[in-house]
């Protein structure tokens, strides 16, 4: 599992350079679900985050602070309020 999709692609390249095949010899997964990798093969398993929701929460927190609300931050979202969606694709299929 990689910290993001781009790192997963780098790991895949390194594995391939050693003659390993994905997913037969090694499974690969990323984190981001970035559009630019839609054509990567085998399709990359990843975790998709609700970026629009994260943006809205960040905007609200910033607006409160700019308005002078220096409260305890209780109104701000915590990391537990954001949930990702696991998207399983071919890069993590079990070897046949």
Which role fits each region the language model picked out?
Residues 1-96:
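Flexible loop/turn connectors
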């Amino acid at each position: 599992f990689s910290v993001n999709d781009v790192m997963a692609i780098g790991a895949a390249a390194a594995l391939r350079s050693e003659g390993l095949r994905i997913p037969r010899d090694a499974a690969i997964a990323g984190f981001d679900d970035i559009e630019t990798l839609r054509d990567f093969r085998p399709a990359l398993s990843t975790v998709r985050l609700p970026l629009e929701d994260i943006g809205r929460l960040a905007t609200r927190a910033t607006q409160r602070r700019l308005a002078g609300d220096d409260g305890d931050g209780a109104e701000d979202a915590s990391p537990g309020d954001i949930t990702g969606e696991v998207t399983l694709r071919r890069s993590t299929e079990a070897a046949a």
